[in-house]
Amino acid sequence: MAIKHLDVLKLLAAAGLVEAIDGDVKRCALWARLGPEAAKREPAQIGTEVIENVLLRWNCILQADPAEVAPLYVHKTALALAVCLHRQGFADAQLTDAAVAAIVALNAAVALNDTFHRRSADIEALLRSPAAMPARRPPLLKAHTAWRAGDVVGMQVADRHHAFHVREVSQGAPIVEFYDIVQPSPLAWEQLQGVIARGQRLNDGRQYVDRHALYGLQHQPDPAHQFRLLASGIAQGPDSTHLARHSGLYAVTDVFRMTRDLLP
């Protein structure tokens, strides 16, 4: 009997990881399928966009130094990503191959139960079968976050590292302000002392306060390792007195759009 996507995800025995990946895939799939233009796009085009956006976050695990992330966690991540994407009608040959290799590695390490071992061929067959996009878009999930006002957070985008301060939480989204610093290695709280706030240059040539409601930043710690807590209980964020003010309090975005905006 064929195995279902949810059955595979349950066999991974990693509820938190699966929840995070499934939520990210559904968020990206929803946005890619919204609007009148989406109906004119080929499923393969939508799939390419979704996979690229999802991997912007989860490559922090898939491409991590083995000394920093346990190999079995990487394998579970690869398999969960492939299954969640396939469930929404998307597939990537390279990720599918990584997921199949993960099945072999997880079995070799006896990391999961006998049912996973017995159904391994069925899981591979599922992943290599044509992915069919569901007729209905994924629902918009209710916003929530485990991050708190006063948290200072490191953020990885490709091979660069940024940091921001959570000013407050509003309607399930952290309101964040970035420190004006970026470097190729992870930041530490000590490196942020005296660093001013990063501004946004507008058409008038002036630098303005740049704050964002960052939806999709939910889990703490972050299972994707893209966001890391550097400090907590920090009442004062980066100094922004050098920046001009405008009428808006903050811009609404999410972790994927913000990540794209920060790409080198």
PLM region spans:
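Short beta-strand-centered aromatic/proline hotspots
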Residues: 160-171
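N-terminal intrinsically disordered, low-complexity, charge/repeat-rich segments that act as generic
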Residues: 2-107, 243-264
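Short amphipathic alpha-helical segments that mediate assembly, nucleic-acid/protein binding
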Residues: 5, 27, 119-120, 211, ...
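Short coil-to-beta transition motif at edge beta-strands of beta-rich domains
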Residues: 142-157
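Short solvent-exposed strand/turn elements
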Residues: 173-198
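Conserved hydrophobic/aromatic beta-strand scaffold that supports enzyme active sites
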Residues: 152-154, 163, 178
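Mixed-charge, Lys/Arg-rich low-complexity intrinsically disordered regions
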Residues: 110-146
